[in-house]
């Protein structure tokens, strides 16, 4: 499987309008054309909070993703609706193609319908985007999965997935130096306990601040809340 990771900004109080227009004009049509929207989150804390969303779509392969794009481009009705009702709302869209790292927790390959998850309980997600110097991601991943992930599975926190970038920012001819981590928390209190433990637990603090961060060039973090049409919740 490969995944499309997308960031959409709609400033000036237009995000709610964007949610409604996306569900009405595009959500069903895009799924009919072969993509599965597995996750959609509003940014609650972080840059562009209250005016941006992250989306993840699942495809069987890069070829399937390209075929999906071609079908969408040929759909004149969808394109007309998008230009009229969605494009004027969006300020910025950034897209990358990512692939789950082998050591990462598995994601389902088959998902229920969007309507089957509406109204179901939702947790919170922290998304961290990790940047590495070219050629150093493999060394980071060894430390990350062998030491950091087990230590951070506490206070209700669970790593949901970990991606490397295949196409987009942070890629070179020889590989990826940009990864995306998604971790779920049952509630904000759980996230706060988890984060405070990285200060109060001296052994954990050393692991995070000295061992792990020595392998990372830069970290960007946002707290996300699933939209009601998000399958990941």
Say what each PLM segment does.
Residues 2-17, 102-169, 174-189, 228-233:
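Surface-exposed interaction/gating patches
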Residues 16-39, 45-50, 58-101, 146-147, ...:
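An amphipathic, aromatic/His-enriched active-site/gating alpha helix that lines ligand/cofactor pockets
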């Amino acid at each position: 499987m490969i995944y499309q990771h997308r960031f959409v900004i709609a400033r000036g109080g237009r995000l709610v309008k964007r949610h409604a227009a996306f569900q009405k004009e595009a959500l069903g049509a895009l799924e009919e054309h072969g993509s599965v929207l597995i996750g959609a989150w509003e940014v609650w804390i972080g840059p562009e909070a209250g005016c941006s969303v992250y989306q993840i779509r699942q495809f069987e392969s890069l070829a399937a993703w390209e075929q999906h794009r071609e079908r969408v481009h040929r759909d004149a009705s969808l394109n007309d609706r998008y230009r009229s009702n969605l494009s004027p709302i969006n300020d910025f869209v950034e897209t990358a193609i990512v692939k789950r790292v082998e050591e990462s927790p598995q994601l389902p390959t088959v998902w229920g319908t969007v309507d089957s998850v509406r109204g179901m309980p939702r947790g919170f997600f922290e998304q961290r985007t990790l940047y590495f110097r070219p050629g150093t991601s493999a060394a980071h991943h060894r430390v990350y999965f062998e030491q950091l992930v087990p230590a951070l599975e506490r206070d209700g926190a669970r790593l949901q997935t970990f991606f490397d970038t295949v196409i987009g920012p942070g890629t070179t001819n020889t590989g990826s130096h940009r990864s995306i981590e998604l971790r779920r928390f049952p509630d904000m209190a759980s996230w706060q306990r988890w984060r405070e433990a990285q200060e109060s637990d001296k052994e954990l603090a050393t692991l995070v601040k000295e061992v792990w961060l020595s392998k990372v060039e830069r970290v960007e973090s946002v707290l996300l809340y699933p939209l009601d049409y998000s399958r990941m919740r």
